[in-house]
A protein has these predicted regions:
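Glycine-rich, often proline-containing surface loops adjacent to acidic residues and nearby aromatics
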Residues: 8-21, 54-74, 162-163, 188-197
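Secondary-structure boundary elements
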Residues: 38-49, 84-100, 171-173
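Aromatic/basic-lined ligand-recognition segments
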Residues: 64-153
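Low-complexity, glycine/alanine/valine/leucine- and proline-rich hydrophobic stretches
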Residues: 143-193
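TerminUS-proximal long segments
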Residues: 184-241
Length: 241
């Protein structure tokens, strides 16, 4: 299955070449979910899905969500193009780390694009408490030290931001000097943030984003005393251009 934001549909393709499509458009989540599951059944794919959205308080299960919602094709296309541009920089940043690192991936619950580096050292149990997200999953995800960065499109009064945090937060991390100048520490979020607008309007957006990713990682790794010589590698000049 894949989301096609050129034709604005969901493609379901099997290894035998059978193909089904479900249009992306205005409507209810319940109807969309029902259409996707019906197409899967027609292909002989019987799958169980946990239908309550994760990381969202007071979430409505997909099949019960009958609120009509709009679909702005132009806004979706712009958002997708932005994510593709960010992914390129995130992957370049990821390539200079030889330790364990997540892929550049998208979290549907919090709706953020992220990449996470691991030091290899254990971390204290995560406190959990994320809405509609099992505590044991949070504890497993944060069982080892991480430095994580990503992009969040905002919501609930917050503008779009790039973010960077460390778990557990090492002493002094929040006082580190990071780049670019528009980057600041947020006590509310417990992480460094950089307004999306600061990157979008920069003379060199790629360089501005890379400066944020690298400087916040440097701050986390130094404060937590990661074995940086073992975990990092230098990219050839042509790979960084």
């Amino acid at each position: 299955m894949r989301l096609d934001f050129v034709n604005h549909d969901v493609e379901i393709e099997t290894t035998t070449g059978e193909l089904r499509r479900v249009d992306l458009g205005p409507g209810t989540v319940g109807n969309f979910y029902g259409s996707v599951m019906a197409q899967l059944r027609q292909l002989g794919i019987d799958v169980e899905v946990y239908t309550t959205p994760s990381e969202i308080a007071d979430a409505t299960p997909f099949e019960k969500d009958d609120e009509h919602r709009p679909y702005d094709r132009e806004a979706v296309t712009r958002f997708w193009h932005a994510l593709v541009s960010m992914q390129r920089v995130f992957n370049q940043f990821r390539a200079s780390f030889r330790g364990k690192c997540s892929p550049v991936h998208f979290f549907w619950g919090s709706f953020d694009l992220a990449v996470t580096r691991f030091s290899g050292k254990g971390a204290p149990p995560h406190p959990g408490g994320v809405p509609n997200f099992p505590d044991w999953v949070a504890r497993e995800a944060y069982s080892h030290e991480v430095s994580s960065a990503g992009f969040w499109p905002g919501g609930n009064g917050h503008d779009a931001i790039f973010y960077s945090y460390a778990y557990p937060k090492p002493d002094g991390f929040e006082r580190a000097s990071v780049r670019p100048d528009a980057a600041t520490w947020s006590d509310e979020l417990g992480e460094f943030v950089l307004p999306y607008s600061a990157v979008r309007e920069a003379d060199d957006p790629d360089a501005a984003l890379m400066a944020f990713l690298q400087s916040t990682y440097d701050a986390a790794a130094d404060a937590a005393e990661w074995d940086r010589s073992a975990l990092e590698c230098r990219l050839p000049e042509d790979a960084r251009s």
